[in-house]
Each structure stands twice: as structure tokens, then as C-alpha cells.
Amino acid sequence: MAKKTQKRMPRRREEFTYRGYSVADLQQMALSELLPLMPARARRKFDRGLSREHEKLLADLRSGDENIRTHLRDMIIMPEMVGRSIEIHNGKEFQKVEIQPEAVFHYLGEFALTRRRVAHGSAGIGATRSSKYVPLK
């Protein structure tokens, strides 16, 4: 049998589309055009209006600042944020998050988890009745 000497082609990642629109198309749209595409929860947030803090975060993103830190976990990820890295506070520290196209119209807080899984060790001396008789090391 003859061996195949062809190189494997790297897998091409399909271009992300949101409800039939590419990220570039979404970035060109005005907010009034984006509202019908958003899920209901995000649409309600924009209908009620953004707070000053949310407006300031969007202004910082538009200005091109590299280091953006925020406590605004309830901010909706807009198409203009794609490709940027934002540090989101999780209650203890800031976690750096790279905004991917798949994250559009999700909340920032979904990507900086506030709880960590607890890995309990073995019981210590006196933790239970049976551990009273465990010899010390």
C-alpha cells in the first residue's frame, strides 16, 4: 500500500453568526436594529436605559483603553466588545476575560465565576468520633 504524503489541513473554524448575522454585521448595526435580535432579558435592560456606570464602561471600550476593570457583572456584552479583554470582578479578585463572538448578548458576570469548587481533604483529629483514635503522624 502506498502511504499518503498529503499534509492534513488544519480545521477551519466556522464563522460565528448570531441569528444569521456575522459579528461584523452586528457591529455595524445601530442599537435600534440590534434590539429585535436580542433575547428578551437583554432587550428589557436596554429599554429601561443604561446607568451612568454602564455608559462609562461603553465609553471606555470605545476609547480603546487596554486595561479595563469593572465590577459591572450585569452589563450585557455588545458586539463592539468582541475581541477585547476585560477584567471582571468576581467578589474577591479581577478575572481577565477575552470576549469571544459566542458571548454576544450574555452578561459579563457569566464569565467570571464567583464560587469555586471545594475540594475537602480528609477529616482532622477530633473531626468525628472515630477519628479520635487515629494515631498522630
UniProtKB/Swiss-Prot annotation:
Keyword Ribosomal protein: yes
Gene Ontology molecular-function annotations: rRNA binding; structural constituent of ribosome
Gene3D superfamilies in the record: 30s Ribosomal Protein S19, Chain A
Gene Ontology biological process terms from the UniProt entry: ribosomal small subunit assembly; translation
Similarity-based family: Belongs to the universal ribosomal protein uS19 family.
Function text: Protein S19 forms a complex with S13 that binds strongly to the 16S ribosomal RNA.
Protein's recorded name: Small ribosomal subunit protein uS19
Natural source organism: Methanoculleus marisnigri (strain ATCC 35101 / DSM 1498 / JR1)
